[in-house]
């Protein structure tokens, strides 16, 4: 059986094997649960879908047949519990394997899956549940998580059902036990591709997170993500480092990967440990790997060997720009070039260093052929080469495949991001003469100092080359004379002390590696940087814009 994604897409390539045109081609009733999971299970029941490993050494492999049966059992039970098409169901399942068959069950029912991270506190859950009228929550039975979920119920008028897995908890229905007596046959529910499928909350680098809803074409838009950016292969094993509550999980832990016929590697851990991640990659024969920039930084800074990636053929990253120095150090050891990509919770892969493309280190690549991506000025005119502007997507009136169908409370907060069918990302970049895109910053992260416009990433990139710097964030601080001055907030590598002498050394280091006006006049050493629940640096919090 050839990978099933070919049934639902049409691709065109140039003489170098580079994707130059891509179209989604699916019936109006396409449903990932039936038409991908069940279809593969029927054709190749023993095909591996998922390898699960926890930090205590417990291991379990799931075939597509097992995922198909478990999801149908779960769908039958949830239906009996009153969950129906269109209902919103929140999933707080960490990296537990129950996530994969449970979300597939929700897709079969036609319910709207709402993945959320286990790091949420009670007030975070209350806000999200009430914002979108969540009907049920399915969570891990872990004490802290289930306690927060239970506490939230009293403050959520429309929250009707609580389910948990792996542990009996008062006030919850034990889902993984309840489904054991259910039938593995589930009658197909009629769903349409333009109906709500999955809902994420934005990571909220500024202000409250906003709900973002995708329709049933969303998994198919991730074919490019998996096949032509991550370069996963039929029968391979892909590892994306992500909690299931983040949008990154949809990019790398289920949809595009299963459409391409590759199994996903799931390592379930409490605290990130780069040595353990490397062991999993090496010992389980991971063939393709994707991780946020922070993970690569820790891997490089903490040390690794070529042997750790002996079976890996392709590595990718997205989430925020990765410093070229890290890319170069990683390639020097492994021979693997980290390929960057760019997208948002509201989209799939918009821009990337796709298979067959030459890579310019530091560039996020070229636009995906699925989208009409441009860089524009504030007045909407397209920018010239090397001119910084905002990344936008020109959509059709019905929104393109993979672009969210609504953003904001009850779909009413689109006005700032969708203007005349143009989706505004809020991210700044420029394109060089060869069409490669170079990320600059979020629009509100640009520092205006003494008439200069300074992007934080270029300074962060310089600082990251210094041996003492583990992580850093550049922000602007108000200044009467200059408008703003540059501030560097730095996490030091273990063993370094945050002295005045080191501050002076770092300032001089920046001056000698970039234009002197960009150097940080203020340096603060901290133990950690404030981040969103998805791991992005909250520069707004460092600036003091958000309390």
Listing of model-derived features with the role each one plays in the protein:
Residues 367-370, 381-416, 454:
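Conserved ATP/PPi-binding loop(s) of AMP-dependent carboxylate-activating enzymes
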Residues 120-121, 126-127, 137-142, 289, ...:
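AMP-binding/adenylate-forming catalytic core of the ANL superfamily
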Residues 259, 286-291, 300-360, 372:
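Gly/Ser/Thr-rich phosphate-binding loop
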Residues 45-48, 164-171, 180-201, 208, ...:
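Conserved pre-ATP/AMP-binding loop-to-beta segment of ANL
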Residues 80, 104, 108-177, 285, ...:
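Structural core segment of the AMP-binding/adenylate-forming
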């Amino acid at each position: 059986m050839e990978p099933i994604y070919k049934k639902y897409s049409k691709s065109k390539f140039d003489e170098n094997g580079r994707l130059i045109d891509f179209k989604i081609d699916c019936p109006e009733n396409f449903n990932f649960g039936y038409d991908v999971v069940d279809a593969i299970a029927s054709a190749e029941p023993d095909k591996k879908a998922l390898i699960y490993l926890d930090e205590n050494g417990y291991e379990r492999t799931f075939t597509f047949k097992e995922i198909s049966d478990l999801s149908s059992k779960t769908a039958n039970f949830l239906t009996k519990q009153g969950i129906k098409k269109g209902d919103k169901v929140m999933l707080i399942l960490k990296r537990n394997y129950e996530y994969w068959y449970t979300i597939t069950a929700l897709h079969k029912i036609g319910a709207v899956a709402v993945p959320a991270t286990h790091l949420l506190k009670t007030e975070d859950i209350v806000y999200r549940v009430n914002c979108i009228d969540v009907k049920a929550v399915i969570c891990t039975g872990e004490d802290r998580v289930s306690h927060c979920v239970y506490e939230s119920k009293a403050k959520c008028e429309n929250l009707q059902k609580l389910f948990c897995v792996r542990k009996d908890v008062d006030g919850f229905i034990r889902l993984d036990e309840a489904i054991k007596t259910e039938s593995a046959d589930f009658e197909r529910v009629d769903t349409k591709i333009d109906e709500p499928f999955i809902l994420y909350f934005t990571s909220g680098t500024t202000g409250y997170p906003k709900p973002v809803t995708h329709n049933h074409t969303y998994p198919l838009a991730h074919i490019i993500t998996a096949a032509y950016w991550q370069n996963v292969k039929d029968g391979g094993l892909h590892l994306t480092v992500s909690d299931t509550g983040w949008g990154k999980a949809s990019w790398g832990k289920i949809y595009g990967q299963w459409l391409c016929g590759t199994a996903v590697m799931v390592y379930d851990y409490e605290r990130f440990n780069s040595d353990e991640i490397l062991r999993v990659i090496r010992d389980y024969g991971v063939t393709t790997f994707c991780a946020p920039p922070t993970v690569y930084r820790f891997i490089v800074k903490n040390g690794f060997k070529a042997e750790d990636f002996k079976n890996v053929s392709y590595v990718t990253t997205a989430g925020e720009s990765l410093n070229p120095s890290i890319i170069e150090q990683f390639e020097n050891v492994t021979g693997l070039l980290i390929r960057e990509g760019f997208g948002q919770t509201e989209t799939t892969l918009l821009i990337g260093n796709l298979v067959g493309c030459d890579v310019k280190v530091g560039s996020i690549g070229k636009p995906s052929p699925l989208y009409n991506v441009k860089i524009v000025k504030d007045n909407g005119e397209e920018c010239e080469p090397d001119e910084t502007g905002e990344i936008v997507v020109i959509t059709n009136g019905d929104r393109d495949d993979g672009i969210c169908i609504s953003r904001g409370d009850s779909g009413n907060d689109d006005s700032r991001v969708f203007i005349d069918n143009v989706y505004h990302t809020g991210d700044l970049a420029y394109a060089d003469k060869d069409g490669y895109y170079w990320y600059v910053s979020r629009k509100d992260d640009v520092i205006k100092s003494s008439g200069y416009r300074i992007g934080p990433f270029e300074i962060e990139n310089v600082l990251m080359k210094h041996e003492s710097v583990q992580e850093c964030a550049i922000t602007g601080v108000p200044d009467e004379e200059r408008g703003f001055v540059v501030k560097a907030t730095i996490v030091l590598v273990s063993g370094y002390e945050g002295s005045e002498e080191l501050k002076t050394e770092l300032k001089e280091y920046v001056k000698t590696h970039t234009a002197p006006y960009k150097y940080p006049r203020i340096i603060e050493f901290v133990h950690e940087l404030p981040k969103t629940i998805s791991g992005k640096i909250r520069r707004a919090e460092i600036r003091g814009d958000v309390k």
